[in-house]
């Protein structure tokens, strides 16, 4: 061990943090690490977790949007049911609907190369696709969509996420590299 190096004590869950009001909203491109970070946050802090894809898209129908009123009803139900939560997604218009209730906004922005690599290594998502083969069939489309993040317009674009983040007055952080502690 190097001179002056410190060994960190094992982490324990702080009662203050354990019971704190945590309402974390995570936004970013596909492959930016939103789901991974949300899962870790939920486990570390005992939070309910909502993946926006689960309410925005028709189950097992790739890129078929549900009616906006159904999405809003499901989001409102989640917010009313859970005091402590983490919500993640790239759907900026839906993120806007939950923004008033969050205690922290996290913008995961690691760059296109990281997002592409993460999407290429993504395991099968049975809640989205009927099979790994079906998921792999859609991969070229997803990779193309990820590459367009910084140039496209609309609520799933970098420009929208950047504006949302910059305009938010509450606690927020942008992560551009590395991993983030839950």
Positions of PLM-derived features:
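Conserved substrate/cofactor phosphate-moiety recognition/catalytic segment
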Residues: 39, 43-83
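Conserved lysine of the Walker
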Residues: 34
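Hydrophobic anchor at the beta1->P-loop junction of P-loop NTPases
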Residues: 26
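The conserved Walker
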Residues: 30
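Glycine-rich phosphate-binding loop used to anchor ATP phosphates in small-molecule kinases
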Residues: 71-113
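A glycine- and Lys/Arg-enriched "phosphate-lid" helix/loop adjacent to the NTP-binding pocket
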Residues: 110-156
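Short, structured coil segments at secondary-structure junctions
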Residues: 45, 101-102, 168
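NTP-dependent small-molecule kinase module
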Residues: 19, 148-182
């Amino acid at each position: 061990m190097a001179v002056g190096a410190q060994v960190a004590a094992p982490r324990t869950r702080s009662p203050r943090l354990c019971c704190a009001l945590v309402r974390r909203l995570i936004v970013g491109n596909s492959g930016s690490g939103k789901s991974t970070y949300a899962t870790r946050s939920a486990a570390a802090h005992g939070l309910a977790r909502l993946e926006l894809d689960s309410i925005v898209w028709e189950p097992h129908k790739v890129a078929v949007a549900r009616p906006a009123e159904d999405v809003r009803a499901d989001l409102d139900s989640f917010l009313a049911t859970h005091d402590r939560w983490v919500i993640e997604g790239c759907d900026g218009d839906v993120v806007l609907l939950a923004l008033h209730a969050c205690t922290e906004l996290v913008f995961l922005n690691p760059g296109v190369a990281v997002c592409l690599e993460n999407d290429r290594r993504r395991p099968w998502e049975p809640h989205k696709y009927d099979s790994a083969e079906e998921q792999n069939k859609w991969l070229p489309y997803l990779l193309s969509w990820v590459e367009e993040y910084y140039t496209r317009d609309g609520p799933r674009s970098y420009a929208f996420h950047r504006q949302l983040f910059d305009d938010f007055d509450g606690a927020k952080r942008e992560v551009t590299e590395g991993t983030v502690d839950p």
